[in-house]
Amino acid sequence: MAKKGNISSRNLRISDQIQKELAEMIQREIRDPRLGLVTLQSVALTPDYAHAKVYFTVLGAEPEVAAAILKEKAGYLHSLLFKRLHIHTVPTLHFHHDTSVEHAIEMSKLINEANATRSKDD
């Protein structure tokens, strides 16, 4: 079985499928104007497939508000996943705001500022 680090190819396939299905379900099934535009960045499954950490970014809403809404709807989304996926165990969903995008933007700004200062000094 092919592995990426310690993650099996089956784990990766199921993670990808969960991410795809959840993205569609959040867009179509959750009608809360406070949610904003949610993008699922990744899904990390535990080896026993019992839990899934779902990392998301949000545009047009506060991340804390979006996380609270997604946490509130996790049971509903779990039941929809159970109907769509053909696997024995559908994991419990745990939503986490992914700050890596904001961190990358901040680092890019700092690099640009450093380069601008450096070119002025030359």
UniProtKB/Swiss-Prot annotation:
Superkingdom field: Bacteria
Entry keyword Ribonucleoprotein: no
Chief place of localization: cytoplasm
InterPro entries from the UniProt entry: KH_dom-like_a/b, RbfA, RbfA_dom_sf
GO molecular function terms listed in the Swiss-Prot or TrEMBL record: ribosomal small subunit binding
Location in the cell: Cytoplasm
Keyword set, alphabetical order: Cytoplasm, Ribosome biogenesis
GO cellular component, one term: cytosol
Record GO biological process: maturation of SSU-rRNA
Subunit-level organization: Monomer. Binds 30S ribosomal subunits, but not 50S ribosomal subunits or 70S ribosomes.
Function: One of several proteins that assist in the late maturation steps of the functional core of the 30S ribosomal subunit. Associates with free 30S ribosomal subunits (but not with 30S subunits that are part of 70S ribosomes or polysomes). Required for efficient processing of 16S rRNA. May interact with the 5'-terminal helix region of 16S rRNA.
Entries under HAMAP family matching the protein: RbfA (MF_00003)
Family per record: Belongs to the RbfA family.
Protein's recorded name: Ribosome-binding factor A
Organism ancestry: Bacteria, Pseudomonadati, Pseudomonadota, Betaproteobacteria, Burkholderiales
Gene: rbfA
